Amino acid sequence: VPDDRYLSLIALRVFRAGLRHSVVDAKWANFEEVFWHFDPEKVVLMSAEHIERLMQDTRIIRHLGKLKSVPRNAQMLLDIRQEFGSFGAFLAQWPEDDCVGLWRYLAKQGQQLGGLSAPRFLRMAGKDTFVLSDDVVAALVAQDIVTKRPTSQRDLAPVQEAFNAWQAQSGRPLCQLSMLLALTVNH
């Protein structure tokens, strides 16, 4: 997968956060156009003035923080490309048993990729990961793995360990384990 498609997916995830996906998806062709089809080498050169002009473009969602994240995330991709050859190679080499570490890396090196954005982007990109949805967190609490939504490194460590153990026992991908765990919660 070319890096421009990863940048497009990252931006799509960022813009979908907190909004109806259908609203973002309906405008996505316009995003592709104004961000030069998410070519990281072009996007990284976008000036603050250019981003300000995009705030006037009614064809896209005009959220300054999210718009500013696109060039920053392009820089992250270019930095990763320099070290690993491509963003896809970077994702492929990341150990499967350290999803939380990958989430933290993306949140720290990128912009607007905290919370559930990194794991949801990874799912969109085809990288196996679990997602801490409300139901998954409720199931983890019910199994005494955590006492509340895990956010700190310390709280996330036992979650990663539990998913690693379940994967070793079952042979199932983390995405399936996450979904199965969510189904154990009674509403």
Predicted regions and their residues:
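Buried hydrophobic packing segments
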Residues: 10-11, 73-77, 140
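N-terminal polyanion-binding entry modules of DNA glycosylases/AP lyases
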Residues: 1-63, 67, 180-187
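Short, well-structured alpha-helical segments
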Residues: 25-28, 64-74, 115-122, 137, ...
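Alpha-helix N-cap and coil->helix boundary residues
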Residues: 23-26, 45-46, 82, 131-135, ...
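Alpha-helical ds-nucleic-acid-binding substructure associated with the helix-hairpin-helix region
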Residues: 37-112
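C-terminal accessory module of base-excision DNA glycosylases/AP lyases that mediates lesion recognition
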Residues: 92-187
